C-alpha cells in the first residue's frame, strides 16, 4: 500500500505560522499589489542641537562661561560619558593658560577608584610623573572622585597654574592645589597628544 506523500516542509511551516496567528486572534494580511514607485523624497534637514544648559556650579566658578563643544567617549562600543567644554573665551592650544571647565555626564555606573587610576594613567602618558606625585595624586583623586552612575555630572574647573576644583552634580567635592596636576589633568582631553583626538576636536568645536 502506498503511503500518502508527506507535505513539503515549507507548507508545514506556513501552516504552523497560520495556526499561531489564529491562536493570537490575528489573521495574515493578504499580499497587496506593489504600489507604483515614486521618486524618493530627500530627508528633511535636522536643525542643529541647541547648546546645553549652563551647569549651575559654573555661574560663580566661571563667570561668562560659554559652551564650546561636546564629545562622546566610547570604549569597546560602550557609551562611557558625554564631555562638554566651557570657557569665557575661545580655547586655543591645550587651554592650559585659560580658565575653563570640563563637564562629564556619565552614561553608566563606574567606580571612583577606577576613574582615578585611569586618569593617572592618561596623565602619565602626557608628561613625566614621578613616584611621589603618582602616589599623592592617586590618593587625592580617589578621595575626590565618587562612584558614579548614569546621569551623574562630574565637573572639573581649571584655575590655570594654581588648582583644579571638582563638583559632583553641582556640589563642591574639593580641590587639588597643584599647577602640574592641573596641566596634565586637563591635558587628558585638550592636549594635542591626547589618546582621544576625535573627542578633543569635538570639544574644541571642530577645531584641532
Give residue ranges: language-model regions.
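Terminal leader/tail segments of proteins
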Residues: 2, 32-36, 46-208
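Bacterial Sec-dependent signal peptides at the C-terminal "C-region" and cleavage site
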Residues: 26-32
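N-terminal secretory signal peptides
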Residues: 1-7, 14-26
Amino acid at each position: 500500500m502506498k503511503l500518502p506523500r508527506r507535505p513539503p516542509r515549507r507548507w508545514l511551516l506556513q501552516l504552523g505560522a497560520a495556526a499561531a496567528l489564529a491562536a493570537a486572534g490575528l489573521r495574515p494580511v493578504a499580499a497587496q499589489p506593489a504600489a507604483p514607485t515614486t521618486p524618493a523624497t530627500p530627508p528633511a534637514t535636522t536643525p542643529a542641537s541647541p547648546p546645553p544648559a549652563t551647569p549651575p556650579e559654573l555661574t560663580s566658578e566661571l563667570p561668562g562661561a560659554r559652551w564650546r563643544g561636546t564629545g562622546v567617549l566610547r570604549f569597546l562600543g560602550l557609551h562611557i560619558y558625554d564631555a562638554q567644554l566651557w570657557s569665557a573665551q575661545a580655547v586655543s592650544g591645550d587651554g592650559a593658560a585659560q580658565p575653563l571647565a570640563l563637564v562629564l555626564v556619565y552614561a553608566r555606573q563606574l567606580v571612583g577608584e577606577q576613574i582615578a587610576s585611569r586618569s593617572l594613567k592618561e596623565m602619565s602618558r602626557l608628561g613625566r610623573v614621578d613616584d611621589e606625585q603618582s602616589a599623592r595624586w592617586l590618593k587625592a583623586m580617589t578621595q575626590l572622585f565618587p562612584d558614579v552612575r548614569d546621569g551623574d555630572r562630574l565637573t572639573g574647573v581649571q584655575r590655570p597654574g594654581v588648582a583644579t576644583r571638582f563638583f559632583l552634580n553641582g556640589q563642591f567635592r574639593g580641590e587639588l592645589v597643584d599647577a602640574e596636576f592641573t596641566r596634565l589633568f586637563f591635558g587628558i582631553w585638550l592636549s594635542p597628544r591626547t589618546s582621544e583626538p576625535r573627542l578633543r576636536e569635538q570639544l574644541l568645536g571642530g577645531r584641532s
